Swiss-Prot record:
Keywords: ATP-binding, Cytoplasm, Ligase, Nucleotide-binding, RNA-binding, tRNA processing, tRNA-binding. HAMAP family: TmcAL (MF_01539). This is tRNA(Met) cytidine acetate ligase. It is an enzyme of class 6 (ligase). Its EC number is 6.3.4.-. Catalyzes the formation of N(4)-acetylcytidine (ac(4)C) at the wobble position of elongator tRNA(Met), using acetate and ATP as substrates. First activates an acetate ion to form acetyladenylate (Ac-AMP) and then transfers the acetyl group to tRNA to form ac(4)C34. ATP binds at residues 81, 142, 167. It catalyses: cytidine(34) in elongator tRNA(Met) + acetate + ATP = N(4)-acetylcytidine(34) in elongator tRNA(Met) + AMP + diphosphate. GO terms for biological process: tRNA modification. GO terms for molecular function: ATP binding; ligase activity, forming carbon-nitrogen bonds; tRNA binding. It is found in: Cytoplasm. Belongs to the TmcAL family.
Length: 393
């Protein structure tokens, strides 16, 4: 956050945040309201939600939704972390892909026909057409997402400028702490769910406010969220589905339904199920997203109605500092998308999916807590934060 503010000289900062389920196809560690508090306490001025229909998607769709929201809020610059760290290289890579589009598409098809996943095929195609040091490594996950952010800016004819910060020490998929001060989200999550885990081990790697709020969530609700807690629900759902039922679920295609129904029979945990399910063609993340859609019963028809090829249909405001509130007041007449401060009276196909996802997310809670949290999610007004006193209002 400090590096972003230093690099962009921003007046205010806006974060677009996933809701209950994340882009890599897993439940968020804590609710979006607690994560909003974390963001505000760390210096963000406005926190808005990226709808489920965009947030649990491949990088291209995820980026398109996020950029459309930022564009609607009249953001002048975005900043993202990347393995490359040189923004010029992203623009060079986009230019090469555009100029070599026919060759690129042919290579992607060729590598997919050889049994590779789309992500792997795309990475291999880039390796073949990108030879200059001025291009980015498209096998790296944060480079891929940054590439899609900039493509979305260009596709939406936005005047937004992009900046990037190089990731140091820890890599996206690292499962262990390799540095004294920097750790990947993957390694932090693994530590939190390890035997005899405590928050002490992760405290050097996260802000104090984040550590405090994580501990508070676990104390108040008795749990942090991961896939294993949902596995019994997930397995039960699959045991009651036919291949035809499963084919209606978003991202279930090319016979994947038969493999899923076969592997679930002998799986005793989500991790063992994923180990049995993954192949060269289907990456772990791609499969986790498909499993998330099964868990939330998100169908192809629902995603079609959400019209994800277009821009996000609304802005769900989750939290704001005093500076953020002032910014919204000054610019609200220019913002063309509806800004939702709660969702109890608004209706849209995209919001219908969000409501289902929230319901599933809280399903692991005991009653009456589950019902209370679900009701609060619809009626919850944006969290307000006084940055001068560092207190929530």
């Amino acid at each position: 956050m400090q590096q972003t503010k230093k690099l962009t000289h921003s007046d205010i900062t806006i974060a677009v945040m996933s809701g209950p389920f994340l882009q890599r196809g897993e439940p968020a560690l804590v609710s979006k309201w607690y994560r909003t508090k974390m963001a505000l306490a760390c210096g963000v001025d406005l926190v808005v939600e990226l709808p489920y229909a965009f947030s649990t998607q491949k990088a291209e769709t995820f980026a398109n939704g996020a950029i459309s929201i930022l564009n609607a809020l009249h953001v002048s610059e975005i900043c993202f972390g990347s393995e490359d760290g040189q923004i010029e290289n992203f623009y060079n890579t986009i230019s090469v892909q555009k100029n070599e589009e026919e060759t690129f598409n042919r290579l992607v098809k060729q590598f997919m026909n050889a049994g590779n996943s789309y992500a792997k095929a795309t990475s291999e195609a880039f390796l073949h057409i990108l030879s200059s040091e001025k291009n980015i490594d498209m096998s790296q996950p944060n480079n891929i997402l940054g590439f899609q952010y900039i493509k979305a800016i260009l596709m939406q004819n936005s005047s937004m400028q992009a900046q990037t910060i190089k990731r140091f020490a820890s890599h996206y998929h690292d499962e262990t702490f390799n540095d004294q001060h920097i750790a990947s989200a993957t390694s932090i999550r693994k530590q939190l769910f390890s035997e005899n885990s405590s928050f002490t081990e992760i405290e050097p790697f996260i802000p104090k406010a984040t550590a405090s709020l994580l501990a508070s969530y676990k104390q108040n609700y008795g749990t942090l969220h991961n896939w294993e807690q949902y596995f019994s629900f997930f397995k039960y759902k699959l045991m009651t589905m036919s291949p035809e039922d499963l084919r209606h679920i978003y991202e279930i295609e090319e016979g994947l339904e038969h493999r899923i129904l076969s592997k679930i029979q002998t799986s005793s945990s989500f991790h063992s199920f994923m180990e049995a399910l993954k192949t060269k063609r289907y990456t772990w993340t791609r499969l986790q997203r498909a499993c998330t859609h099964i868990l939330t019963n998100t169908t192809k028809e629902e995603i079609h109605c959400a019209n994800i090829e277009q821009h996000a249909p609304y802005i769900r405001l989750l939290g704001m500092s005093q500076k953020g509130q002032t910014y919204l007041s000054k610019n609200k007449k220019k913002i063309e998308l509806p800004i939702l401060t709660h969702t109890k009276t608004f209706d849209h196909p995209t919001l219908h999916i969000d409501r289902k996802a929230n319901s599933v997310y809280f399903s692991i809670m005991q009653e009456p807590l589950r019902a209370q949290l679900l009701k609060q999610d619809a009626t919850h007004h944006p969290i307000r934060y006084d940055e001068t006193t560092a207190k929530f209002l």
